[in-house]
UniProtKB/Swiss-Prot annotation:
Subunit organization: Associates with the 90S pre-ribosome. Interacts with RNA helicase DHR2 and RNA helicase-like protein UTP25.
Note: Present with 1460 molecules/cell in log phase SD medium.
Cellular-component GO terms for this entry: 90S preribosome; nucleolus; nucleoplasm; nucleus; small-subunit processome
InterPro entries attached to this UniProt entry: Nucleolar_19 (IPR022592)
Any single biological process term in GO: endonucleolytic cleavage in ITS1 to separate SSU-rRNA from 5.8S rRNA and LSU-rRNA from tricistronic rRNA transcript (SSU-rRNA, 5.8S rRNA, LSU-rRNA)
Membrane-traversing stretches: none
Compositional bias per record (Basic residues), positions renumbered to this chain: 179-196
Region called Disordered, residue ranges: 101-196
Subcellular localization, as worded in the UniProt entry: Nucleus, Nucleolus
Native source species: Saccharomyces cerevisiae (strain ATCC 204508 / S288c)
This protein's name: Nucleolar protein 19
Keywords from the named record: Nucleus, Ribonucleoprotein, Ribosome biogenesis
Basic and acidic residues: compositionally biased ranges: 142-155
Length: 196
């Protein structure tokens, strides 16, 4: 019998709650009718409300036109249409209202602009294989050695031209040069002070 009492109490409570809600709704509807009857007395107030509403809509449109950045990329204002651009999300409006996939934001795009790529053929990129990396390093090393040899050759030719004129001056008066050994005060050479 207690189960039946519980159900009856719940039904009574629901009825009271529904009655309270309907009374509140009726009171609010009465307030709205009164405000409609009095209306807006001034056209300037109405114009102000329309102006505020228009500003709000313009702000909303401007917000929806803001660009969305893909992960790992920067802002670019490209006017050309790519094949993948139709699938990607580029503005906040496309993100909120569009049916495009959000996963397109996570895709890292490869730079296709030749102006953005550096003209260094020895630069190692993440797409290079181990063999290509080894080849690029070998080519870079060969280039460095070639430059080094070229520099040494140019230094030796310059020093040879000066050496002929210097031989005459050296015979006239050669002074021995003294070189002193540099001393560094290293900590491990010093004896440690005894602790008291």
């Amino acid at each position: 019998m207690s189960r039946a009492k519980e159900l009856q109490e719940k039904l009574n409570l629901q009825a009271k709650l529904q009655s309270t809600f309907s009374n509140n709704t009726a009171a609010v509807l009465d307030w709205l009718k009164e405000s409609d009857e009095t209306g807006i007395s001034n056209d300037t107030e109405r114009n102000k409300q329309l102006k505020d509403h228009k500003e709000l809509e313009d702000g909303k449109k401007a917000f929806f036109k803001l660009p969305v950045l893909q992960i790992g990329s920067g802002l670019h204002f490209r006017t050309q249409d790519d094949a993948s651009a139709k699938e990607d999300i580029h503005t906040i409006g496309e993100f909120i209202e569009g049916d495009k996939k959000v996963s397109s934001l996570a895709k890292k795009k490869k730079r296709s602009d030749p102006g953005l790529q550096r003209n260094n053929m020895y630069r190692i990129t993440k797409d290079d294989t181990k063999a290509m990396i080894a080849l690029k390093r070998k080519m870079r090393k060969g280039e460095k050695e070639g430059l080094r040899k070229k520099q040494e050759h140019s230094k030796s030719s310059v020093s040879n031209s000066y050496s002929a004129s210097d031989e005459e001056d050296e015979d006239a008066g050669t002074m021995p040069q003294k070189s002193t050994k540099k001393k560094f005060g290293l900590l491990f050479d010093k004896k440690k002070k005894a602790r008291k």
